[in-house]
Amino acid sequence: MSDSAGLIAHNWGFAIFLLGVVGLCAFMLGLSSLLGSKAWGRAKNEPFESGMLPVGSARLRLSAKFYLVAMLFVIFDIEALFLFAWSVSVRESGWTGFVEALVFIAILLAGLVYLWRVGALDWAPEGRRKRQAKLKQ
């Protein structure tokens, strides 16, 4: 038996499954376009708000601080993922893996200290921070 015939014989179940999924999706899309309503109007292009016409704009202006917090969350979440993977294989990696994990943590801590020193993690406006510092003295 040739390689291509063996590959086809081995994966025929997956091919039938894939054809079934594509066929079911095409059937559901076709049925919804046939049976769905065809009415067009101004309200069709508006977002649904409990049957009420929308008032104002849906765009919200967010402070850049929220994006900074989201980026820090992603960075430290990935750090936790890498450290979890390291902790699973700590016996196999030995002291070399331990030193590599320490270097990884040190680099991330250096970045965190830099952000802290620059003031990227300060949420209060500078004037309010100065007033609070004067009150504490």
UniProtKB/Swiss-Prot annotation:
<protein>
    <recommendedName>
        <fullName>NADH-quinone oxidoreductase subunit A</fullName>
        <ecNumber>7.1.1.-</ecNumber>
    </recommendedName>
</protein>
<keyword id="KW-0812">Transmembrane</keyword>
<keyword id="KW-0874">Quinone</keyword>
<dbReference type="InterPro" id="IPR000440">
    <property type="entry name" value="NADH_UbQ/plastoQ_OxRdtase_su3"/>
</dbReference>
<feature type="transmembrane region" description="Helical">
    <location>
        <begin position="66"/>
        <end position="86"/>
    </location>
</feature>
<dbReference type="GO" id="GO:0048038">
    <property type="term" value="F:quinone binding"/>
</dbReference>
<dbReference type="InterPro" id="IPR023043">
    <property type="entry name" value="NAD(P)H_OxRDtase_bac/plastid"/>
</dbReference>
<dbReference type="GO" id="GO:0030964">
    <property type="term" value="C:NADH dehydrogenase complex"/>
</dbReference>
<keyword id="KW-0830">Ubiquinone</keyword>
<dbReference type="GO" id="GO:0050136">
    <property type="term" value="F:NADH:ubiquinone reductase (non-electrogenic) activity"/>
</dbReference>
<comment type="subunit">
    <text>NDH-1 is composed of 13 different subunits. Subunits NuoA, H, J, K, L, M, N constitute the membrane sector of the complex.</text>
</comment>
<comment type="function">
    <text>NDH-1 shuttles electrons from NADH, via FMN and iron-sulfur (Fe-S) centers, to quinones in the respiratory chain. The immediate electron acceptor for the enzyme in this species is believed to be ubiquinone. Couples the redox reaction to proton translocation (for every two electrons transferred, four hydrogen ions are translocated across the cytoplasmic membrane), and thus conserves the redox energy in a proton gradient.</text>
</comment>
<dbReference type="GO" id="GO:0005886">
    <property type="term" value="C:plasma membrane"/>
</dbReference>
<keyword id="KW-0520">NAD</keyword>
<dbReference type="InterPro" id="IPR038430">
    <property type="entry name" value="NDAH_ubi_oxred_su3_sf"/>
</dbReference>
<keyword id="KW-0813">Transport</keyword>
<comment type="similarity">
    <text>Belongs to the complex I subunit 3 family.</text>
</comment>
<keyword id="KW-0472">Membrane</keyword>
<feature type="transmembrane region" description="Helical">
    <location>
        <begin position="95"/>
        <end position="115"/>
    </location>
</feature>
<dbReference type="Pfam" id="PF00507">
    <property type="entry name" value="Oxidored_q4"/>
</dbReference>
<keyword id="KW-0997">Cell inner membrane</keyword>
<keyword id="KW-1003">Cell membrane</keyword>
<feature type="transmembrane region" description="Helical">
    <location>
        <begin position="12"/>
        <end position="32"/>
    </location>
</feature>
<keyword id="KW-1278">Translocase</keyword>
<dbReference type="GO" id="GO:0008137">
    <property type="term" value="F:NADH dehydrogenase (ubiquinone) activity"/>
</dbReference>
<keyword id="KW-1133">Transmembrane helix</keyword>
